Amino acid sequence: MPKIKWTNKDFNVFKIDGLEQRMNALNDHVRPKFHQLGDDFATYFSSKLGEEFFPHVAKHARRTVNPPQDSWVAFAPYKRGYKSLPHFQIGLWHSHLFIVLAIIYEAPQKNVMAERLLAHPSLFEQLSDDFIVSGDHMSPEAISLEEAKEDKLKELLLRLRDVKKGEFLIGRHIPKDQATKLTASEFHQLTEQTFNSLLPFYNVIVGKDLK
């Protein structure tokens, strides 16, 4: 049964001053939920995509001064890491919950991945207008897919292809006020439905479905 219910306390972790204090709150309140989601959705991805997926809960281990502004659990078919691969994420900023598929600048084949997405524009027509896209995983900002279809979508994909720091994220952002009202069952259902919609994108990105 779904177990994860988000609260204001979870989101307010990212308003706590100080690295140690914020990390302690993150470890106490948020990371246990990410670990649970990691177990649940690693099984989901392994079943849906036909290879073993592993959860990676953000550790923020390199931080020595500035506290993290967001945190997440990522999913990829590699036990030792995820950043060099296209990967799925569930995470929080202080303002919203995010459920996304991401290609970040550390992916060595991101130019090829971008070309595959550019060659399949019809994929984006299959998503509802409440989906978002972004070109920066370190920013909470995003643009609605409906608005991006005019010209920003192609611009983001070309940047992913041509610019070393180019990135591409697609999925849903759920504002804090909405996320905290979701029951555990509603959140699980929304997350699974979002990922179901993103699976065809993943298959195209990794070259599994290039019809």
Curated annotation (Swiss-Prot):
InterPro entries: UPF0637, UPF0637_domain_sf. The lineage of its organism: Bacteria, Bacillati, Bacillota, Bacilli, Bacillales. This is UPF0637 protein Bsph_1379. It comes from Lysinibacillus sphaericus (strain C3-41). Belongs to the UPF0637 family. SUPFAM superfamilies: YktB/PF0168-like. Transmembrane segments: none annotated. Pfam families: DUF1054 (PF06335). HAMAP family: UPF0637.
